[in-house]
Amino acid sequence: DFNNDGKPDFVLGNHGLNSRFKPTDGSAVRMFVNDFDQNGSVEQIYTKQSGDRHIPYTLKHELEKQIPIVKKRYLKYSTYNKESLEDIFGAEALSNSVVQEFNFASSAVMMNKGAGKFEIQALPRKAQRSWMFAALVTDVNGDGIQDIIMAGNLEGAKPEAGQYDASY
């Protein structure tokens, strides 16, 4: 109960803002899931939106490990880097994909307004340095105000994402 109104509020751990994945109101980060090369193995590809095109976050050498035809089709990084997912696999492959998206990366608190209504408030910028996997709500300094102790970091991310180790 962060605002002492007698209703339980919630801490929402999330991705944070210190990342290549930066969704905005008009442009979500999307994950396309499909057997793009029809080999019986399902692949997932993260994209950012540029106009009506979906640009892969996945680096060329990472994608060609999953889908070898990419190596034959795009010999140079400079050629691959100009392509959208639609260019690489075609509109039909994308329309047959399962698509998941996220458009809010901040860790936040969800304030209970009562009657089933909630308001989400992003935590301060310092709290967005890394993922939040756990949180403890307690009055750390005895001032009567609830504080949030966060736990995060992730070191096993793919190279195109980088390590998430900026919190302490």
Where do the PLM segments sit?
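Beta-propeller-forming repeat regions
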Residues: 1-168
